[in-house]
Every structure is written in C-alpha cells, then in structure tokens.
From Swiss-Prot:
<feature type="glycosylation site" description="N-linked (GlcNAc...) asparagine; by host">
    <location>
        <position position="542"/>
    </location>
</feature>
<keyword id="KW-0730">Sialic acid</keyword>
<dbReference type="GO" id="GO:0019031">
    <property type="term" value="C:viral envelope"/>
</dbReference>
<comment type="subunit">
    <text>Interacts with glycoprotein L (gL); this interaction is necessary for the correct processing and cell surface expression of gH. The heterodimer gH/gL seems to interact with gB trimers during fusion.</text>
</comment>
<comment type="similarity">
    <text>Belongs to the herpesviridae glycoprotein H family.</text>
</comment>
<feature type="topological domain" description="Virion surface">
    <location>
        <begin position="25"/>
        <end position="646"/>
    </location>
</feature>
<feature type="signal peptide">
    <location>
        <begin position="1"/>
        <end position="24"/>
    </location>
</feature>
<feature type="glycosylation site" description="N-linked (GlcNAc...) asparagine; by host">
    <location>
        <position position="77"/>
    </location>
</feature>
<feature type="glycosylation site" description="N-linked (GlcNAc...) asparagine; by host">
    <location>
        <position position="162"/>
    </location>
</feature>
<dbReference type="GO" id="GO:0046718">
    <property type="term" value="P:symbiont entry into host cell"/>
</dbReference>
<keyword id="KW-1032">Host cell membrane</keyword>
<keyword id="KW-0812">Transmembrane</keyword>
<keyword id="KW-0472">Membrane</keyword>
<keyword id="KW-0325">Glycoprotein</keyword>
<feature type="glycosylation site" description="N-linked (GlcNAc...) asparagine; by host">
    <location>
        <position position="604"/>
    </location>
</feature>
<dbReference type="GO" id="GO:0019064">
    <property type="term" value="P:fusion of virus membrane with host plasma membrane"/>
</dbReference>
<comment type="function">
    <text>The heterodimer glycoprotein H-glycoprotein L is required for the fusion of viral and plasma membranes leading to virus entry into the host cell. Following initial binding to host receptor, membrane fusion is mediated by the fusion machinery composed of gB and the heterodimer gH/gL. May also be involved in the fusion between the virion envelope and the outer nuclear membrane during virion morphogenesis.</text>
</comment>
Amino acid sequence: MPASSVRLPLRLLTLAGLLALAGAAALARGAPQGGPPSPQGGPAPTAAPARGPTLFVLVGDGSARFVFQLGGLGALNDTRIRGHLLGRYLVSYQVVPPPVSAWYFVQRPRERPRLSGPPSGAELVAFDAPGVRRTYTTAAVWPAEVAVLADAEARCPAAVFNVTLGEAFLGLRVALRSFLPLEVIISAERMRMIAPPALGADLEPPGPPAGRFHVYTLGFLSDGAMHQTMRDVAAYVHESDDYLAQLSAAHAAALAAVVQPGPYYFYRAAVRLGVAAFVFSEAARRDRRASAPALLRVESDARLLSRLLMRAAGCPAGFAGLFDGRAERVPVAPADQLRAAWTFGEDPAPRLDLARATVAEAYRRSVRGKPFDQQALFFAVALLLRAGGPGDARETLLRTTAMCTAERAAAAAELTRAALSPTAAWNEPFSLLDVLSPCAVSLRRDLGGDATLANLGAAARLALAPAGAPGAAAATDGGAEEEEEDPVARAAPEIPAEALLALPLRGGASFVFTRRRPDCGPAYTLGGVDIANPLVLALVSNDSAACDYTDRMPESQHLPATDNPSVCVYCDCVFVRYSSAGTILETVLIESKDMEEQLMAGANSTIPSFNPTLHGGDVKALMLFPNGTVVDLLSFTSTRLAPVSPAYVVASVVGAAITVGILYALFKMLCSFSSEGYSRLINARS
C-alpha cells in the first residue's frame, strides 16, 4: 500500500482526536465553542464576549492545507492538545522565539527616487478591485479576509513560490527543499500572531515599525544571515512607492541570484518581485486605472523572474500569470508586440517579420556604434529561435554574435558588479535583459569569467522560451515538466563546447575560433599570435563523412575593390579583427552594398570596425567567405572613398563656382590697377 494512503487515515485519526480533546477541554471549562476572528485579525466580535478568540490550526504536510476550529486559546494549556499541535502532521505555532523586541527596526530606510510618472494617455485600462473575498491563511498569523486582485503560484516537488495581491495586502511565501522557508505579509491592518500563552494572545508578528503599511517577516532564525535577510526584505516596501524602481531592484537581485546562486540573493529577488507587483497594484487600485504598457511590463517581468528564480531552486516552473488575464486583454502598442507575444505565448507567425526587422535594425545600429533596444532584440531573438526556420535561427545567431563586442561585454559586466552590491541604488530603469542581450544569446564565449558566462548563458536559454508556452508554467506535484531543448544548441549543433566564438553559415557549417585544433574540419592556425593564447580557426559541420583533417595557413591577399554599384561581391562575408595577444576584437557580417562600400573605403570609412586608423599595428584582419575560404586581408587593390550625399556634391559645386568668381574679380582688379599705374608713369616721363 502506498505511503500516502497510509498517512491519510493517520491524519484523520489525528484530527479526530484533536477535535475530541478540544471539545473535552471546552466542556470541562463549561464554555461554548468560540467563533472565528474578525477579518482584520482583531479581537472576536463583541456579540459573544464569553467565547474569546478562536484558534485556527493549519494541517498538512506541504501538499495540502486544512483549517480547523478549536476552542479558545486556553486549550493550549492542555498538554495533550499541545502535543498534537507539535506533532508530525501539524505545524508548530511557536515560530518566533523570545525576545520579540530584537526583531523590530530602529529607523525606516531612505526612500528612493521615482522612475515612472502617473498613468496618462489613451493606453489606460480599467483596474477595478474584484468583489471576491478570500481567507488568507498562514502557519503563524491569524487568518485574514482579503479582496484578491491577483494570485500566482509556481510549484514543483522541489519548491513553492506563491504571491497573493489584495486590496492593501501582499502575502508572499517561498518554501524550498534546499533553502529555509520565508514568508512576508504586507497589510494596511494590524495582524495578530498565533503565539503561546506566555507571549500573549494579542502579539503582533515581527516586523519594522508601521509606516504606510504593516510589514511582517516570518521564518526560522537559523543563523545571522537569515536574520539579516528578514530584516532587509521587511524594509523594501517603504523604500519607494514607484513600481519601476522596485522592478529595477528586482531585476538586479535576480541577476545577482543568477550569477551567484544561493539563498542570499534568492530571497531578496523573490520579495522584490512581490513588492514591485504590490506597489503597482496599489497605485492602479487607487487610480482605478493602469497604463497598458506598464501592466504588460509587470506581467512579463513577473513571469520571467519567477522562472529564473525557480530554476535556481531546481524547479522548471514559473508563474503562469499574475493578474488573472487582465494583461492579456490590454491594447498592445507596436513597440510592445514582441514582448506580448513572448509573455502570452501567442502564435509567433504573425510577428516573425517584425522580429526579423528588429534584429536587422539593431544590427545596423550596432555596427555604426549607435545604441539599440536590447530588450526588443531579446524578444525578437526568442521568437526567431523558437519559431523561425533553420536559416532564421542561424542568421540571427550570426548577427547577435557580431553585436557582442568587448565594449558591450564590459558594460554587462559592470551592471553585474553593480547588481552584486547590496548598496546599489537604481536611479534609472534596469532590466536583466540589458545584460542577457545580446551577448548571452550569441555564440561568443570568450568574454568574462567562465562561471559568470555559464550562468548567464543558462539564464538566457531558459528565458528564451515564451512565458506562455507549455512547460514554462508551474509544474504539478506529480513531477516537473521536461526541460525544453536549448534553442541555441538546436540551431547550431555542430559547434563544439570549447569554441571561443562561432559564426554559423547557412549551409549547416560554422567557422569556430578555438585554442586547440578541433577533432574534425579544416583548421587554420593564425600566425603572429602569442603562443600562450594561440588562435585556431576551423570550419566544422555535422557531416562526419566529409570530415577534413587538413591543417592550413590563411593566404595573405590584397582583395580587389568592386566598381559595380548594383552587385555586392562581399555580401554574406564576415570581417574579423584579432590581436597578436590572441584576442578576437570584433566580427562584422557584410549584409548590404552600403556596408561593402564602407569596407573598401579604408581610412575614410565611417564604420569604426572597418577603419584601420582606429586600430594598432598589432591588429590583423581576416575575411571569411560563405564557401569556407579564409583570407588574411592586407588591403583592397584600390581605395574607394565612402559615398557622399547629393547635398554635399551640390554644396561643393556652388562653393567652387563662388571661389572661381572671387578669383576672377581679384584678377580683374589687379590688371586694372597695373594698367592704370603704367599709363601715369609714361605720361609723367613724357
């Protein structure tokens, strides 16, 4: 017989005995059974003063919870009832050891600046509170009746993460197999703790002094770190009443949890996410309206961050939805269509053209050193890798790899360091996607620390799956959902694990840079490179029958410049710069005639990667052709000037004409003066 079927009768017997003991104790005192507490957790109604408060006991082993009414708190003095309360299948109510005064804060934290303004414009949506009220139960605090605005839960055998949003109420619970449980309650009303008689029947749960809200943190004092965590997270709601500032802090904490897995950042990121949703819902509830882009942002971030946090707990689960379908009914602005498609798992086919255009525009701006929307790029890459064809996926990875420069990797590393700082104040909007895009969704692995890159890459691959797709929602108690295949590995399966950088081609092969020769494929050893950091360029493919073990040297050539304005000879080629130290500086996919002309312009090029005057003498260039040819590029046979605009030509012609006119006028003046002067001299002599 299964163990679960044995536990059920035992549980029923335990409950029956518990209720019998409670009834016997009540009869012995001659007191009638008490009624439930008020919804605010205050004293019992004055209509029955003799009854006293009622004890609610939560029964269960984690998979289910039941609430039973017992007699008054006086029943706790009965040693038999106390034994049942502390039994295996019931929860202990004594979760906060004395002295309770050690849990309270001395001062409130400093409030941070606002990052977002009040909702305005035509994109407003109604945000009315529902009429449904529900009892919020917990193991340590008297039940409270809450008008629920949103409820989300991610669950698997390894962890449970629950967020309940109500009118001026937040209940957040994290129960993990690997970490100690933590619960945070934010309420406009004072709540009462279920406590032993020695601590008093009207004891407030631990938390900081009441500000705009009462904040309570419940957990186990395992060590000083857990104590400090509970004190820190209790201060979050009073730091800022701006949801965007709270979301930025949640993204920073989630980034830290991804880079350095463990309970320290996990707790902080989970509570930040809940507080951000609470601050947003409170503002929307007060205004009875919300900005559609803001609602979509909170919904998508909740699904993204919950998935990353649950994965850190060993669970392939995430919130299936936060605001119970509200966000799915809002109007979506053109700039948010890719985010909405990712968030709700919509059919990506109508959005593929927009995704391709987004990647192409981001690449064009990146090549010219201009900023681009990294978050929109991430959602576009996610759609193309999941729903685009093999050509879409490989070309997308080729572009994101080219966009991942050393400068962007350094900027992402700086954001990561700031996220790991507990004192960082996010005065500007920040998103984890600003770090993951484009480098973490590329095939470049030579920038940054190995552990950091591996963790960011794993987070990016997890985040690429649409939030509304099967397997991205919460798993059941019967077992976790199977993990989806890595979309990056699926798009380019031929790339070896030791590759520093890979450039996928359309035919199923890829150029890869490594420190040692791969097992298969023609390999080019790049000369003039530090022997401590050798660079090997190989052409690899999945076709083992055509495996070539030839070792070659790239041929140094002066490539011919093209004069045909309608034919792009070097389109689909990849331009690579590397240094003698064995560092790959940049890669550029030549995708248009304009880019080809900039490449051949040499020192006159306006694209920094192509301009040789911006690089030192130890920097060399390669040209990689789609057919697998590798050329050590010296120069082009003729230098072509970068194309100039018609306005510049017209201005030059007009300027030249004016200059000629001025010179002619000066010449006439000089000639006239000389002729007149000679005439006077002749007349004087005569």
